[in-house]
Structures are given as structure tokens and as C-alpha cells.
């Protein structure tokens, strides 16, 4: 421990029991290099480390997204959306919404890294729909109400008649429906830059 005027304070260096870079995640840029590591569930990491210590599992160290037969998914404490593996090193992260009526949905979670204030601006741009030349077009959404707080997401969005059913009927190869695509309720995270 370090000494501060005769008082023992913090350790000279810290050796964590679990790899906190995998718990907290990291995203950074250095001179000529970058690194992006998503957060992983500490319970899964501890479980894996215990199995590794007790040699109950053999592992080929290919990447942190897939250690042998033990699968790690990106994890965000309190996130109510979904995380799905879509490729060897790629994960789809979706926010959450529910259909309230024929033309109304309620968004209760945004994708990781999307904040409510910029999202409100994005929704306003869908109401004030203009083309690249500034010509006014028909609004993509009719109206929205935000009751979001610093700790919760709550957007109620009203679509023009029939638009919601049209959006719900389309899905892409990653099972992203038209609502999620239009309202940017999905994003991807990769483990190829660790």
C-alpha cells in the first residue's frame, strides 16, 4: 500500500480478480490505432473463470465473443431491449416497443448509445419531413409524446392511418421490422476490433 503522511491509503497497483475491461467495455482511439470492446455480464465472466480454473472445459482462445463452447453476449445492466448474435463477431442490439393501437406504438427502450434528447430531435425531423432540396413532404409520423426521464424511456408515437401495419409487415434478414428500421431502434456491436 502507498503511504500518505503515515496513513496507509490505496494499493501501489491494483490486480483485479476479474477482467474489468470486459465488464466495463472500452471504446478508444489512439495514434493510428483504435479499440472497441463491448461490456459483458460479470456473472458470466465469473462463471467462465471458475470453470477455467477448475479445468472443466477446454478452450481455444479465438476471441472474447466466442471462447470455445462458452458464448459471451454483450451485456448492459438495466437494458430492457434485446441482444442477438447475427454473425461470428457481430451482435444486433434492439430497443423495445409495443403496439398500443392500430396507429400508435410506445417505445420503452432505445438502442445502446442512443439518448432521449437527440432521439426527440430525430422524431421531430420525421414529422417535419423534407427532401434533400428542402421541399416539404408528407410526415412520416403524425405525432409523438415524450414522457422520458433521465432513467426511463417513454415515447408514444402516432403514425398516419395504415402506416404502422405497413411497417410491421416488413422484415429484413436480421429480423428487423419496418418500425425498428424507420425509427432507428436497432444497432450493431462488433467484436472484431478488440
Where are these regions (language model features)?
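Intrinsically disordered, low-complexity regulatory segments
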Residues: 1-194
Amino acid at each position: 500500500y502507498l503511504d500518505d503522511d503515515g496513513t496507509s491509503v490505496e494499493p501501489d497497483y491494483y490486480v483485479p480478480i476479474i477482467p474489468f475491461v470486459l465488464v466495463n467495455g472500452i471504446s478508444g482511439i489512439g495514434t493510428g490505432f483504435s479499440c472497441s470492446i463491448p461490456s459483458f455480464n460479470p456473472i458470466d465472466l465469473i462463471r467462465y473463470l471458475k470453470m477455467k480454473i477448475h479445468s472443466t472445459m477446454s478452450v481455444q482462445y479465438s476471441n472474447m465473443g466466442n471462447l470455445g463452447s462458452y458464448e459471451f453476449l454483450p451485456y448492459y445492466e438495466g437494458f430492457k431491449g434485446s441482444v442477438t448474435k447475427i454473425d461470428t463477431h457481430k451482435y444486433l442490439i434492439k430497443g423495445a416497443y409495443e403496439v398500443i393501437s392500430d396507429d400508435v406504438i410506445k417505445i420503452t427502450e432505445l438502442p445502446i448509445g442512443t439518448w432521449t434528447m437527440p432521439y426527440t430531435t430525430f422524431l421531430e425531423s420525421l414529422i417535419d419531413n423534407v427532401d434533400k432540396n428542402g421541399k416539404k413532404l408528407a410526415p412520416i409520423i403524425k405525432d409523438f409524446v415524450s414522457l422520458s426521464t433521465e432513467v426511463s424511456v417513454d415515447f408514444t408515437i402516432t403514425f398516419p392511418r395504415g402506416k404502422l401495419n405497413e411497417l410491421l409487415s416488413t422484415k429484413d434478414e436480421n429480423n428487423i421490422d419496418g418500425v425498428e428500421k424507420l425509427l432507428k431502434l436497432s444497432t450493431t456491436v462488433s467484436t472484431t476490433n478488440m
